[in-house]
Every structure is written in C-alpha cells, then in structure tokens.
A protein has these predicted regions:
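N-terminal Rossmann-like NAD(P)+-binding domain of SDR-like oxidoreductases, especially those catalyzing
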Residues: 1-164
Length: 164
C-alpha cells in the first residue's frame, strides 16, 4: 500500500483530501499540530489500517525527518498553514513560523528524503490570497503576487521557497 503524508490534515481541505486518499486505498499519515483550524470530527471513523495521525508541528524538523525516514512516503501534500487573515494582522509571528519556517523545514526534509526515494513527490497547497484583491475575473498562476495581509505574504513566501 502506497504511503502518503498529508500535513494539515485536520483542516477543512486537508480532511477532505485524507478521505479521498483513503477511498483510493492509500495509507495516509496525517501530520497536524492541532490548532484553532483543526477539527477531529471531520476524520472520525476512519479505518485504522489505512490511517495514522501524528500530532506534530512542521517547525519541528528533527521529528519531521524521523517520520519521513520511518514511513518513506511516495507523496507529501503540504496543507499545513496558519490561515486566518485577521489573526495574521494581530499576530504575524505564528504565520511566519508555520507558513515560512515550517515549509522550509518540510522542503529540507524532503530534499534529504528524495536522495533515496527518487520518485517521491511534494505537492504544496497555496491560496488565492497571494494575488491580493482581484477586482475582475479570476487569478491565474502566472499573475503577479500582491499579498495584502501577513497571511498572504507568508503564503507567497512559502510558494517562492517551493518554486526555487
């Protein structure tokens, strides 16, 4: 059974992704630090043979490295993030730690991981907030980033780390 890590799997999008992956017969390792955005109810009654929950902040690089070594995932979906715009204005430090430092740690661990697991993938999830206030139509991935909150700026920063 192929193993997939989902970071931020207790969030709204992450929990739906976990359900979909389990339906497709993957073994899912859900890494989540458990915060105001986490909801265990979204993942109740999951089959234990296909699912493992690990409470962990992706800012903890050493433990993250150990998990990648132990499970050797074929894919990592990074949905871990502080996501509340208003909270980012009141206290941007947590957003910088989680969205920038946490993503950097995950990238560093993944870089080490792919030395021995060449076919592994990392899929980083962003937000439309990086494009700022879109007045007409939809944003395209090729549009310029114009973040208008600390949340959007930290997500834009993490996107640039992934792109580089």
């Amino acid at each position: 059974m192929k193993k997939i890590i989902v970071t931020g799997g207790l969030g709204f999008i992450g929990s739906n992704l976990v359900h979909m992956l389990i339906k497709k017969k993957f073994f899912v390792i859900n890494i989540d630090k458990v915060s105001y955005a986490s909801n265990f109810y979204n993942l109740k009654n999951l089959p234990k043979k296909n699912y493992k929950f690990i409470k962990l902040d992706i800012c903890n690089k050493k433990k993250l490295q150990n998990i990648l070594k132990l499970y050797k995932p074929k894919c990592i979906f990074n949905l871990a993030a502080e996501t509340h715009v208003d909270r980012s204005i009141d206290g941007p430090k947590n957003f910088i730690n989680s969205n920038i430092i946490g993503t950097f740690n995950l990238l560093e661990c993944f870089r080490e991981h792919i030395k021995n697991n060449h076919k592994s993938k990392l899929i980083h999830i962003s937000t439309d907030e990086v494009y700022g206030d879109v007045l007409h139509g939809r944003s395209k991935e090729s549009d310029a980033y114009i973040p208008s909150s600390p949340y959007a700026a930290t997500k834009a920063s993490s996107d640039h780390l992934v792109y580089s």
